[in-house]
Amino acid sequence: MEKFGVHNPATELATVGLGSAASVRYNFSAAALYEESIRRGEAELTAQGALRALTGQHTGRSPRDKFVVRDANTDGEIWWDNNKPLSPEHFALLRADMLAHAAGKDLFVQDLVGGAEEGHALPTRVVTEFAWHSLFIRNLLIRPETAALATFVPKLTIIDLPSFKADPARHGCRTETVIACDLTNGLVLIGGTSYAGEMKKSVFTVLNYLLPAKGVMPMHCSANVGPDGDAAVFFGLSGTGKTTLSADPARTLIGDDEHGWSENGIFNFEGGCYAKTIRLSAEAEPEIYATTQRFGTVLENVVLNEGREPNFDDGSLTENTRCAYPMHFIPNASETGRAGHPKTIIMLTADAFGVMPPIARLTPDQAMYHFLSGYTAKVAGTEKGVVEPEATFSTCFGAPFMPRHPAEYGNLLKDLISRHGVNCWLVNTGWTGGAYGTGKRMPIKATRALLAAALSGELGQVEFRADPNFGFAVPVSVNGVDGGILDPRSTWADKTAYDVQAEKLVSMFIANFAKFEDHVDGGVRDAAPGVKVAAE
């Protein structure tokens, strides 16, 4: 076997059964991985110097093909209602067959770290058969100093072989695509998909399993910090504005997607960003756009024209086009990936029913209720001409990545909020003046003004009213914001229609939360919508 690059000779690939590979390239730089990717026909150079790769059949994650090994250690720890079990016997067969499949191949290795706080960091080795995958994960995770690579010992190993096709009958999986996580032994096997995001989210899943046992809260969120050290966390599902609203030139970006909250404060799990690029423009998101115009960035499934110029408006391959770049490509990004305890938590929702106010203050119990609910709404497909919104509840604002029961994360969050006196706000970036199809999108200018008032502390000093449907506190007036939009009912021409819509949304919340009723205390149960609170 040929070996290239700096690495620890005591932890070579032979130690995990990959000793039959033709060659291994350890910890290659971006420039070297560009050369390998292009030489091997995996990717193309864009006119601006980014690297464009296509993922073929899979242009997004495959959550139905993700499994967790169910063994003596994980049996009582995993939320099996939400995670698919795989027997140790099936995993052993899958591992043996994948290792055999790797024989004779050229492999790429990156030794990286998940977690910017030293005491809670996860040394992670990622083994790939694609050079561009190696660059992708090098961009996304935290890169150790070169000197540290000679003594690097991984606690998690990910083996990603897209050319391997699983056998459902033999391996206990669903299709030829498989993402199998052995949490006990720190091994993730990925086969049958070229979508690079599977590697990133596998690290997140493992951290979401390990950290709560250490009293550390893992979060699917973005985070930033102000000049006075006032950190803020932004929870929210896709399309709610998490990335856009946390990108604030007046504040330092800690990270855009995954963080932990420990006894020392918050810290990024990653060393890069994986941003959506569909309809990306220099005018709307200049910092993200600039990353797509430089060497080192990976563009995933972005259409190029004949001159190799990216066309970010073209979603013909997928709407889920992405770019992956290291954090330092963003001008105001944190160099440490860490900050103190958050002063503010923002929970974002895009309510397409037009019922929720643009901002509401949450008590710790209400914050846990809305965290466990993880609500947003998607608008129906225009091809069917349907204008009825579809409610989406993804617990902890990231159900696919949460191995443990949501109540574990919820109780941890509630405790941290109470202990550190964090101000919590629910922000609706969805519709006002009616539901989707009748109303209009919440003005981004108003959202930013409300957010600025919340982060500065100004919003805590205004007069509030209790929302008659959800019970949370809603500001009556805020400087610089049209007071009319603060009361959603008043923005509807047909008040009766609003009441009907509100009752419908409340009933959806109650039905969704039923599965958590037995796992929370009375205070959280009383935070449910429909529980009327005195108005003033």
UniProtKB/Swiss-Prot annotation:
Metabolic or biological pathway, per its Swiss-Prot or TrEMBL entry: Carbohydrate biosynthesis; gluconeogenesis
Enzyme Commission number(s) from the entry: 4.1.1.49
Protein's GO biological process: gluconeogenesis
Disulfide bonds: none
Cofactor note: Binds 1 Mn(2+) ion per subunit.
Ligand binding (ATP): K201, H220, G236, L237, S238, G239, T240, G241, K242, T243, T244, E285, R322, T447
Statement: the UniProt record of this protein carries the keyword NAD: no
Annotated positions binding Mn(2+): K201, H220, D257
Binding site for substrate: R61, Y195, K201, R322
Entry's Gene Ontology molecular function annotations: ATP binding; metal ion binding; phosphoenolpyruvate carboxykinase (ATP) activity
Top-level EC class as recorded in UniProt: lyase
Protein localization: Cytoplasm
Record keywords: ATP-binding, Cytoplasm, Decarboxylase, Gluconeogenesis, Lyase, Manganese, Metal-binding, Nucleotide-binding
Cofactor(s) listed: Mn(2+)
A Pfam family per the record: PEPCK_ATP
Presence of keyword Disulfide bond: no
InterPro entries per UniProt: PEP_carboxykinase_ATP, PEP_carboxykinase_C, PEP_carboxykinase_N, PEPCK_ATP_CS
UniProt similarity note: Belongs to the phosphoenolpyruvate carboxykinase (ATP) family.
Function: Involved in the gluconeogenesis. Catalyzes the conversion of oxaloacetate (OAA) to phosphoenolpyruvate (PEP) through direct phosphoryl transfer between the nucleoside triphosphate and OAA.
NCBIfam families attached to this UniProt entry: pckA, PRK09344.1-2, PRK09344.1-3, PRK09344.1-4
Protein name per the record: Phosphoenolpyruvate carboxykinase (ATP)
Organism whose genome encodes this protein: Rhizobium etli (strain CIAT 652)
